[in-house]
Design a protein with these regions (language model features):
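Basic, flexible Lys/Arg- and Gly-enriched helix-loop patches that mediate nucleic-acid binding at interfaces
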Residues: 1-242
Length: 242
């Protein structure tokens, strides 16, 4: 059965569906020696190339969806390549699978990061329309009043549009530094930090502790990873109608 080429590429673990669509628009994908166009369909037996390199659309066709959780350490980058030679999260993943990262964390943020071999699942989980909770533990320097909490939950206009926390709860701490637990439903760059900074607060630590119903295991050490249980994977698939 034929399917849209971007879906086949995502299912084969080469990248998300959106990533494949960008390559199609750039003329970098061919099907049976013909330049692919958006909307083109293919089957896994077709000869498909990316930048002239033949890819295997069927390599994961019979493989079950896997999801991996990594406890990212601050200072580790979410990229495969780095001119400065810094450590990458991909150095800590099992090498037997083509992993697609679900969103990313900035350099100084630690905590829960998901990877999957199902590009379609990754794309759905990242898309803003899915409105999936992302919970963070954040240590804030400064005296936070109730009026600040109201502004953060009502919403603030940032340089890239309106943003807000869907929930803010006090997490403890003494003196000038206090911990809070906050929830956002988008994956915008540095969104949590920028919301606090908009009210002149400084974020001294930021840890992602939850994505959807998946929580960061307490015993999972920095830069260690573990597979989600099949029941958890099925719940993730169901949450985005896959």
């Amino acid at each position: 059965m034929s399917e849209r080429i971007q879906k086949l590429i995502a299912n084969a673990g080469y990248g998300s569906r959106r990533w494949a669509e960008r390559l199609i628009e750039q003329g970098r994908i061919s099907i049976n020696n013909q330049e692919a166009k958006l909307g083109d369909k293919a089957i896994i037996q077709d000869k498909v190339t990316i930048d002239g390199r033949l890819i295997d659309l069927g390599r994961y066709s019979e493989e079950e969806t896997k999801v991996l959780i990594l406890n990212k350490q601050a200072g580790v980058i979410c990229s495969n390549k780095d001119e400065e030679g810094r450590q990458s999260v991909f150095e800590y993943l099992p090498e037997n699978t083509r992993w697609v990262m679900v969103g990313r964390l900035d350099l100084n943020t630690s905590g829960l990061l998901l990877f999957t071999n199902n590009g379609d699942l990754a794309n759905k989980l990242m898309h803003p329309s899915s409105e999936i909770d992302r919970e963070y533990a954040v240590r804030v320097l400064g005296k936070v009043e109730e009026e600040h909490i109201k502004k953060l939950t009502n919403g603030i206009e940032l340089e890239d549009g309106f943003a807000k926390f869907h929930r803010v709860t006090l997490g403890g701490g003494e003196g000038a530094n206090r911990w809070y637990h906050v929830v956002v439903r988008e994956g915008r760059k540095r969104e949590v930090r920028r919301l606090w900074e908009a009210l002149d607060f400084k974020v001294s630590r930021l840890i992602r502790t939850r994505f959807s119903d998946i929580r960061l295991p307490e015993k999972l050490r920095s830069n260690q990873s573990e597979y989600l249980k099949p029941k958890q994977v099925q719940a993730l698939l169901k949450s985005v109608n896959l």
